[in-house]
Amino acid sequence: MPKVLYKSSEVDNLVKFEFVEIAKPVFESLEIKEKEGKVYDIESQISNLKEELQLLRDEKLQLEEELAKRQELAKEEVQIESKRLIEEAKAKANEVLEAAKQEADLLQKEAIYKKESIETESNAEIERLAREYEEKLKTDLEIAIAKGREEGYSKGYESGFEDFDKVMRKLHVIIASLIAERKGILESSSGQIVSLVMQIAIKVIKRITDSQKDIVLENVNEVLKRVKDKTQITIRVNLDDLDIVRHKKSDFISRFDIIENLEIIEDPNIGKGGCIIETNFGEIDARISSQLDKIEEKFKNFSLLS
């Protein structure tokens, strides 16, 4: 179709009378294209950032799940390790108790043997003295009888009878003296036996407390079991036992709900392995020396009854 060229005034008239409509330019400017390009780039970056954000969220979720699994695994491992340590502690405590029981049996057997030995020695001494006095009595009696024969049968018989009566009275006195002496020997040896037993016990306890560092923990546990009401607790121990007891502080608090507040201090007057526990209601003495005093008292009572 041939193109028709119009002058500008003619074009204006045609537009004016709506015979012609001038359309907008079909070509966009370079500036608009650049802006649209920038908008596209921004939208692309936003899309990429959204994808990266989603990836980070997914990664965070995976990390949280992995962390939860690790925490659960660690919890199980802690429970297993705690159970193992408790079993070890129980086994060690049983070993210590068994060793102490064996030592106590040995001490008792040694004490009985010592007592029987002393009784045997004292009986032998009494028998020896009795034999000596018996021989002397026989000799005196024979002399008296011989003398009586020399002075006449009748007179000698009476004299011999009187001498025999004197000898018998003397024999009764000697026997009473021997019985009293035997009783004195047994009473004096009883103290020696108790002293010997306690010396051996002290050596045994010292050897056990030196080799078994957690004896003090067993003592603390046993005392805390005897506390029935909620209270503030102060545990006093030897300096050598201070660290091991403080290390178990949280364990004591979790195991014994009677503890309102727990303090652990050093006391130079307490021997290794022992403790004194103070509460709002008084103190409980679990020192090794105090326990040995009770054992000594029981041995003394046993001796007196025997």
Curated annotation (Swiss-Prot):
Q: What Pfam families does the record tag this protein with?
A: FliH
What are the record keywords, sorted? Bacterial flagellum biogenesis, Bacterial flagellum protein export, Cytoplasm, Protein transport, Transport
Which is a GO BP term held by this UniProt record?
bacterial-type flagellum organization
Q: Might you report a single GO cellular component term? A: cytosol
Q: Can you tell which superkingdom this protein's organism belongs to?
A: Bacteria
Keyword Protein transport tagged: yes
Q: Which residues cross the membrane?
A: none
Q: Where in the cell is it found?
A: Cytoplasm
Which NCBIfam families does this one have? PRK06669.1-3
| The family this protein is said to belong to | Belongs to the FliH family.
Q: What does this protein do?
A: Needed for flagellar regrowth and assembly.
Can you say what this protein is called?
Flagellar assembly protein FliH
